[in-house]
């Protein structure tokens, strides 16, 4: 295989069969000519300081001082698939750890993406390769709804093992559903010695599952 190339769809499928790429769950119908489709997972996370939820006639920020959302508001948000969320602009500090609320997405209701809110979502598939460089990006069908699937950091690390967190923004209100084809992954061959992700990764955890919030605060030692 030439160095520095991008795997074709048939080569991705061959590498999965040979165990050089691990995708769980895997469906052959998601193989494209030059990429692999990945589907949307069933959990969404929002920073507590960036949205307002309406429940019982009241609008409550995810956090107001030390007051968290009531169970009623949490249940209402899940029941309505995020329809009761509106933007709430508070300062995000990259030196600080920010808490998130996580909601399960009902596959029948889906989740309504709203402009002005940043959503942490994730792939349903767990992906790992110790040989190739994975690159994740949106699908054109999702992009034409003016939904941005991955704001930045599209390159994955060789050796990473887990579901991929997606940084989702939308221009218009758009409802999305778990299990739908949401993004795609390409696999690049690498040139030179490979570094062990578990030894050199900046934010190494055990297998990453579900949406993971920013860990930028760790670089400041706080």
Language model features with spans:
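DUTPase catalytic domain/fold
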Residues: 1-222
């Amino acid at each position: 295989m030439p160095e520095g190339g991008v795997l074709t769809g048939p080569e991705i499928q061959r590498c999965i069969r040979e165990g050089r790429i691990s995708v769980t769950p895997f469906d052959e119908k998601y193989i494209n000519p030059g990429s692999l489709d990945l589907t949307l997972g069933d959990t969404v996370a929002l920073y507590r300081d960036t949205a307002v939820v309406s429940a019982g006639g009241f609008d409550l920020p995810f956090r107001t001082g030390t007051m968290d959302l009531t169970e009623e508001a949490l249940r209402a948000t899940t029941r309505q698939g995020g329809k009761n969320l509106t933007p709430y602009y508070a300062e995000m500090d990259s030196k600080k750890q920010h808490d998130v609320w996580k909601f399960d997405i009902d596959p029948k209701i889906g989740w309504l993406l709203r402009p002005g809110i940043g959503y942490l979502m994730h792939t349903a598939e767990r992906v790992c390769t110790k040989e190739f460089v994975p690159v994740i990006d949106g699908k054109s069908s999702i992009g034409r709804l003016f939904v941005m699937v991955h704001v930045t950091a599209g390159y994955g690390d060789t050796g990473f093992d887990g579901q991929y967190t997606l940084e989702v923004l939308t221009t218009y209100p758009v409802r999305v559903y778990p299990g739908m084809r949401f993004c795609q992954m390409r696999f690049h061959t690498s040139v030179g010695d490979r570094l062990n992700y578990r030894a050199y990764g900046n934010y190494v955890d055990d297998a990453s599952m579900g949406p993971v919030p920013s860990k930028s605060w760790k670089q400041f030692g706080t």
